[in-house]
């Protein structure tokens, strides 16, 4: 028995480790693993099924086939344990050792390891400084390589063909050594002196000036450094001994009929052994060189195939033409070891079945079929049957259960009571896809699911299936109950809003119940209390929708937090009064005294959660559901064809539109508009028409005429079934109703362009053949899109999870003072997202002061902003707040609670150990399937609003300019001469209410600080022309204006005025190639004037197609227009939307034609153009210049003499995130990414909290590039984890040495995942071969910090409850006793007490 215990303890010893290291295996190491050499290719004797001696399954090498029994049967049973049979050589032990004992093959000739040879960049190639092509020629015996030049003129590593070799041999005899094949490469690698090579390279780096050379040298230095540090030897990349996998990992299974199913590896090994043995024999016979060479090459190829089949040449195929699965294929890809077995496992104690609705369940319950429950809880039932004495042995218990005796069901009830089970619906896109419930036993075979959790699971009852899992250990049950119970997951982790919200028929019922209608039975009655209302309704004295007065008593909390009763008489309806019955105490009736649409119900549950807490809300949600179902049944809403009312105006509107289209067609035929304009205008007309019809239809369906109590006929909201469904938010939308009863409208072709003939009919009228055909186009594409979308969205989620998986909350406060400055998001004058929504649940980074009061802050640093605080700030009129953000968090690993802020799913500051990275990834990835897949072609109305030509304010207040550079015109108005200028309207409190961009050349009619009224116009401009404005007064002088060459004179037929148009330089011919038409402004004497504040001459280079209306010598004043450039109706450019856009942003891809940003602040001027480019110069204040060459086809939007600030756009386009980071820094980049990604989601109506996007951005920015290495060990241009540089710099600072300087680098999520410190995590993500090769050469250690690595090695993850376990484990390593360790780990020794202890410790740490 003692031996047995020793055996168990022995196995336990290996379990505890802190890191995993990967390195190259030396031949000695491989031999030390091995239990013997495999000499024969035989596998098993197909008659006796016994393994052959010395073969691939040999029992002497790998261990016995049966437990404690040798092959020949001489020794059997436990008592001979450890004996080696002298007859068959087998050790008597467990057969399980055949899974762990390895063998080896001694290769007759060295073989290069294909991974280090072919996986790019080739490590052997870098080490030898030879090209892969050359090494392959040597390895595959096409050329000789000089290994030792001796005193000859040959170079080491020089290649010689057969002829050159023979010639050299004749010349020099034996003075030099040259060889071919892997031996030569082995020799070259063995003789490298790493240390001196290193020194030589460092000197070369210092001396070289060429970029490409530097790159190559840096790569080599890194590789050699890696070898030196890891203790690997270069020659180990060429193998002399090949390890053989344990046989049970490459099984050979006899099938019936004398055939065998075998693992491909056996074929590959057999090939290697055959060739190796043949080569050995040939060498012993000293066969001719050419034969030996061929055999060596074949050996090399067979080892290549074994390690990584198909990487070089054609893959070796098996009997059925399918490539054999090599060792590398075993670990990579979705079916490989990592993703199939280590990251995803099949679990015991689980079952699955179809789900049906369980409308009588409480929120924390689910219905579990009895049969299923009995099977799942079998061991528990057995144990209890034994304990009760109903069965003496497990066997007897089993019989009882199989017979399904009556007492079994009673015991099952007891076992199941308060034992939660977990339900999961695939695909699990976010953490709410698995939740815990208490099972309720039901008859039947389907699982019953509570309707309110359907949103979270994204489940419906059209045949969906769900899986059930049983948490077995006490800790698991505890976590399931405390963390995963459906009642603890009321709020969505993505946006902090309730996710347990009624939908569909519940909403319909509640909406029907709370509608109010004119002149219903009982209108105007007054009731003393709700009970009286109920009696009146039950006795049919009143109708549900009648407007009545009711005396209602509510519980309100006063300032001091005391509860008081408040009674008031409320105007309400019968239905709403009945609803008041189920309102929890403390929730004001006013919230329910409205029409309960889905939005209002969500608001109701939200307020309940914030004001009353979890328990009351859960009860309330259940009651709402029951009530909703009851009244939906009473309402009996159904729709018929007559509910789809077609508006009478439809005919007239269509006739008008057709007339307009005809008119444009005529204009086109008489040549007044181009084909493109005609198409755009037609599409515009039809879009507008569609909107008008839709509006008319909604008015028709949504209102009805009724007679009120006074006998007057009035309009009221109708009770049309179709309308109430859409209005309540239960089902259907205005767009869908429009197609049913309005007109179907314009259809898109599969490529996204719009068919200009709309479908004028709706579904009620029916479509004709042509209309039907037109509509199939888009419909079919929709289906194809959906299929693609799901895959794309899943892949995005996977990349996001991978990049952020190791972001965990590790400490309470990192102490940083940095943060992001938050302002409301304003677009085109509308506040899209107010400040309160953006800062809710964030921690303040700096004290917030009111304007004009710098003494006492309104909010102090480190305050968590909850609903009350946010309201306070809103009232005080605060416009900008600096909040903490994960992007600026300074925690070494993970992030701190304060930088993250509120845990959205719980509503309080986030706990230590919360895996915020994974939550962020899920929150962004989960709605991915709702995003569109398409690229929008912006043409026609699809999205182009009418040209805006002025700014009219919507609110009364005062004007504020920001970033505005303007000049004052002679008539007193201001003219904007900058591009980044903005104008905002402030209310009485100084809060910004609206903000607008001011284009260059806009005329501004009010001054900074002026008071204005709503509806007043503050600025206007010409939308069709881009002006060039003079900033000085003087006289015009034309330069390089040559009629017919650089300018063409035109006379307007109507006005008779002459104007000049600048021609396109491409059409000017050679004599004019140096002419640059410029308008210069001079004083009365003809001297050049300069632009105010600079020494640049006041001159304006005119781009092609600009028009000059002034004559040479004409006088101009400040702010006058010198020339104007006509703007073509905005070019239709493709806008990538939806999922591809989100993916592009997260992958930090550079846009196709990126915007050019100013590299520094200064004054713009233009230099001499080259052939296809224009030269733009920015001259800064100290006179230094920066040049930018810009292709001619790109539109430069700045003019000569204009002042730009660093990072401002000078050429239109989509800015590249890398440029934003480089020129403006991390915070503007974060703001840009957040804004762009949110825009995509907002368009689909998906709410995601900013902080999730920030967490991912933090991970994209975790690398930095060394710009100056200082005294550090880093190399210039190297990319390093930011944390490593900071630690190194701290060390250097302590020794008074030079720190390394660095710039932040933005990596896309795929790149960032592969660049992570943990090689296990990277290898299990993508490019497994490359990652492992790199890691092995470096001798990398994986410290198992992230979640993924720990899942793979099978430990608790360092997040949540696992974080406490790991910190205790580390503490144990530093001096706790074994028993204390067991206690903390919560081993079954004493289950209940230690859990509490560990929890208490966790709490004290917090």
From Swiss-Prot:
Cofactor annotation remark: Binds 1 Mg(2+) ion per subunit.
InterPro entries documented for this protein: DNA-dir_RpoC_beta_prime (IPR045867), DNA-dir_RpoC_beta_prime_bact (IPR012754), RNA_pol_asu (IPR000722), RNA_pol_N (IPR006592), RNA_pol_Rpb1_1 (IPR007080), RNA_pol_Rpb1_3 (IPR007066), RNA_pol_Rpb1_3_sf (IPR042102), RNA_pol_Rpb1_4 (IPR007083)
Keywords noted in UniProt: DNA-directed RNA polymerase, Magnesium, Metal-binding, Nucleotidyltransferase, Transcription, Transferase, Zinc
Chain positions recorded as Zn(2+) 1 binding sites: 70, 72, 85, 88
Record Pfam families: RNA_pol_Rpb1_1, RNA_pol_Rpb1_2, RNA_pol_Rpb1_3, RNA_pol_Rpb1_4, RNA_pol_Rpb1_5
Positions that bind Mg(2+): 460, 462, 464
Reaction catalyzed: RNA(n) + a ribonucleoside 5'-triphosphate = RNA(n+1) + diphosphate
Positions that bind Zn(2+) 2: 814, 889, 896, 899
E.C. number(s) listed in UniProt: 2.7.7.6
Cofactor(s) recorded in Swiss-Prot or TrEMBL: Mg(2+); Zn(2+)
Biological function: DNA-dependent RNA polymerase catalyzes the transcription of DNA into RNA using the four ribonucleoside triphosphates as substrates.
NCBIfam families the UniProt entry points to: rpoC_TIGR (TIGR02386)
Designated name of the protein: DNA-directed RNA polymerase subunit beta'
Source organism of this protein record: Stenotrophomonas maltophilia (strain K279a)
Gene label: rpoC
């Amino acid at each position: 028995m003692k031996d047995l215990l020793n055996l168990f303890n022995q196995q336990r010893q290996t379990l505890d480790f802190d890191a995993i290291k990967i390195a190259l295996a030396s031949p000695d190491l491989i031999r030390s693993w091995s239990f013997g050499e495999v000499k024969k290719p035989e596998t098993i004797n197909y008659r006796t099924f016994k393994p052959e001696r010395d073969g691939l399954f040999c029992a002497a090498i790998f261990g016995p086939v049966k437990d404690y029994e040798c092959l020949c049967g001489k020794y059997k049973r436990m008592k001979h344990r450890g004996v080696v049979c002298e007859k068959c050589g087998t050790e008597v032990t467990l057969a399980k050792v055949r899974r762990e004992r390895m063998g080896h093959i001694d290769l007759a000739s060295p073989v290069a390891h294909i991974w280090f040879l072919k996986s790019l960049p080739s490590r052997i190639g870098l080490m030898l400084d030879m090209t892969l092509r050359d090494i392959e020629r040597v390895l595959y015996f096409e050329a000789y390589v000089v290994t030792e030049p001796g005193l000859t003129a040959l170079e080491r590593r020089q290649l010689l063909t057969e002829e050159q070799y023979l010639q050299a041999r004749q010349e020099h005899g034996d003075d030099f050594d040259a060889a071919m094949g892997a031996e030569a490469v082995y020799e070259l690698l063995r003789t490298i002196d790493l240390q001196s090579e290193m020194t030589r390279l460092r000197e070369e780096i210092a001396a070289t000036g060429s970029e490409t050379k530097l790159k190559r040298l840096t790569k080599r230095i890194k590789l050699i450094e890696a070898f030196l540090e890891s203790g690997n030897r270069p020659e180990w990349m060429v193998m002399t001994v090949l390890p053989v996998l344990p046989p049970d990992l490459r099984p050979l299974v006899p099938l019936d009929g004398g055939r065998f199913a075998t693992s491909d590896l056996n074929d590959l090994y057999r090939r290697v052994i055959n060739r190796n043995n043949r080569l050995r024999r040939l060498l012993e016979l000293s066969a001719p060189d050419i034969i030996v060479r061929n055999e060596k090459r074949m050996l090399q190829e067979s080892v290549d195939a074994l390690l990584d089949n198909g990487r070089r040449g054609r893959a070796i195929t098996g009997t059925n033409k399918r490539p054999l699965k090599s060792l590398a294929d075993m670990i990579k890809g979705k079916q490989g070891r990592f993703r199939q077995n280590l990251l995803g496992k099949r679990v015991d104690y689980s079952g699955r079945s179809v789900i049906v609705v369980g409308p009588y369940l409480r929120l924390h319950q689910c219905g579990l079929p009895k049969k299923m429950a009995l099977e799942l809880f079998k061991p528990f039932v057995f144990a209890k049957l034994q304990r009760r004495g109903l069965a003496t042995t497990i066997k007897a218990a089993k019989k009882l259960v199989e017979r399904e005796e009556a007492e079994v069901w009673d015991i099952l009830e007891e076992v199941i009571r308060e034992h939660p089970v977990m339900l999961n619906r695939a695909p699990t896109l976010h953490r709410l896809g698995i939740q815990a419930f208490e099972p309720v036993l039901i008859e039947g075979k389907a699982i019953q699911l509570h309707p309110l959790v359907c949103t979270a699971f994204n489940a419906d009852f059209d045949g969906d299936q769900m899986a059930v899992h049983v948490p077995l250990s006490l800790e698991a049950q505890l976590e399931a109950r405390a963390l995963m119970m459906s009642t603890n997951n009321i709020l969505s982790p993505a946006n902090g809003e309730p996710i347990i919200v009624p939908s569909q028929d519940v909403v319909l019922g509640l909406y029907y119940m709370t509608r109010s209608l004119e002149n219903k039975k009982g209108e105007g009655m007054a009731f003393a209390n709700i009970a009286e209302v109920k009696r009146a309704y039950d006795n049919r004295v009143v109708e549900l929708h009648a407007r009545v007065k009711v005396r209602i008593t509510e519980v309100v909390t006063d300032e001091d937090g005391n509860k008081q009763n408040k009674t008031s008489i409320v105007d309400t309806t019968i239905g709403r009064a009945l609803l008041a019955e189920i309102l929890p105490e403390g929730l004001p009736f006013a919230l329910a005294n409205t029409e309960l649409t889905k939005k209002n119900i969500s608001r109701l549950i939200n307020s309940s959660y914030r004001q009353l807490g979890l328990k009351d809300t859960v009860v309330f949600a259940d009651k709402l559901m029951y009530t909703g179902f009851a009244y939906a049944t009473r309402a009996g809403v159904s729709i018929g064809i007559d509910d789809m009312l077609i508006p009478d105006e439809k005919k007239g509107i269509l006739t008008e539109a057709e007339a307009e289209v005809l008119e444009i067609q005529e204009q086109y035929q008489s040549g007044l508009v181009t084909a493109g304009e005609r198409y755009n205008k037609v599409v515009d007309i039809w879009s507008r028409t569609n909107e008008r019809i839709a509006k008319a239809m909604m008015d028709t369906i949504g209102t009805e005429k009724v007679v009120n109590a006074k006998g007057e006929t009035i309009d009221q909201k109708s009770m049309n079934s179709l309308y109430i469904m859409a209005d309540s938010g239960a089902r259907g939308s205005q767009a869908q109703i429009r197609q049913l009863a309005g007109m179907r409208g314009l259809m898109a072709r599969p490529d996204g362009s719009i068919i200009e003939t709309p479908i004028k009919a709706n579904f009620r009228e029916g479509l004709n053949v042509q209309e039907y055909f037109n509509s199939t186009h888009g419909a079919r594409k929709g289906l194809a899109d959906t299929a693609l979308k799901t895959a794309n969205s899943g892949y995005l989620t996977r990349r996001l999870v991978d990049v952020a998986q190791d972001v965990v909350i590790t400490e309470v406060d990192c102490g940083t003072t940095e943060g992001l400055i938050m302002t409301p998001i304003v677009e085109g004058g509308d506040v899209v997202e107010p400040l309160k929504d953006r800062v809710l649940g964030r921690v303040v980074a700096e004290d917030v002061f009111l304007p004009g009061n710098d003494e006492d802050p309104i909010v102090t640093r480190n305050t968590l902003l909850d609903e009350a605080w946010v309201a306070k700030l809103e009232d005080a009129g605060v416009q900008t707040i600096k909040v903490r953000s994960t992007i600026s968090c300074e925690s070494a690993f993970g992030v701190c609670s304060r930088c993250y802020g509120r845990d959205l799913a719980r509503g309080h500051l986030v706990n230590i150990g919360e895996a915020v990275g994974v939550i962020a990834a899920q929150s962004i990835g989960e709605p991915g399937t709702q995003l569109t897949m398409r690229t929008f072609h912006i043409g026609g109305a699809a999205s182009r609003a009418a040209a805006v030509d002025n700014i009219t304010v919507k609110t009364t207040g005062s004007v504020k300019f920001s970033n505005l550079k303007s000049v004052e015109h002679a008539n007193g108005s201001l003219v904007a001469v900058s591009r980044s200028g903005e104008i905002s309207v402030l209310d009485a409190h100084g809060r910004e209410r609206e903000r607008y961009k001011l284009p260059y050349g806009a005329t501004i009619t009010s001054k900074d600080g002026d008071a204005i009224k709503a509806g007043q116009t503050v600025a206007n401009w010409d939308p069709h022309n881009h002006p060039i404005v003079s900033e000085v007064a003087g006289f015009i002088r034309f330069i390089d204006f040559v009629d017919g060459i650089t300018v063409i004179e035109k006379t307007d037929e109507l006005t008779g005025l002459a104007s000049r148009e600048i021609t396109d330089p491409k059409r000017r011919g050679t004599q004019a190639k140096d002419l640059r038409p410029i308008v210069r402004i001079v004083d009365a004497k003809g001297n050049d004037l300069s632009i105010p504040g600079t020494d640049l001459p006041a001159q304006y280079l005119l781009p092609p197609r600009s028009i000059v209306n002034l004559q040479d010598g004409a006088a101009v004043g400040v702010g006058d227009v010198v020339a104007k450039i006509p703007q073509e109706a905005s070019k239709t450019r493709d806008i990538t939307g939806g999922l591809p856009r989100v993916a592009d942003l997260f992958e930090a891809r550079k846009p196709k034609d990126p915007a050019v940003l100013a590299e520094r602040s200064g004054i713009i001027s233009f230099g001499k153009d080259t052939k296809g480019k224009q030269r733009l110069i920015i001259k800064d204040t100290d006179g230094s210049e920066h040049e930018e060459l810009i292709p001619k086809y790109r539109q430069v939007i700045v003019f000569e003499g204009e002042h730009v600030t660093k990072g401002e756009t000078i050429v239109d386009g989509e800015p590249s995130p890398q440029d934003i980071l480089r020129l403006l820094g991390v915070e503007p980049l974060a703001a840009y990414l957040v804004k762009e990604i949110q825009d995509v989601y907002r368009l689909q109506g998906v709410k995601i909290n900013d902080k999730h996007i920030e967490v991912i951005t933090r991970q994209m920015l975790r690398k930095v590039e060394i710009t100056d290495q200082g005294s550090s060990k880093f190399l210039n241009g190297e990319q390093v984890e930011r944390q490593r540089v900071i630690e190194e710099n701290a060390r250097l600072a302590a020794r008074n040495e030079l720190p390394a300087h660095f710039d932040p680098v933005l990596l896309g999520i795929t790149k960032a995942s592969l660049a992570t410190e943990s090689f296990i995590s990277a290898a299990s993500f993508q490019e497994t071969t490359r990652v492992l090769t790199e890691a092995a050469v470096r001798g990398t250690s994986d410290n198992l910090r992230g979640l993924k690595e720990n899942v793979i090695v099978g430990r608790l993850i360092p997040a949540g409850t696992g974080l406490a376990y790991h910190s205790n484990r580390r503490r144990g390593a530093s001096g706790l006793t074994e028993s204390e360790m067991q206690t903390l780990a919560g081993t079954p020794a004493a289950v209940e007490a230690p859990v509490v202890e560990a929890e208490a410790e966790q709490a004290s740490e917090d």
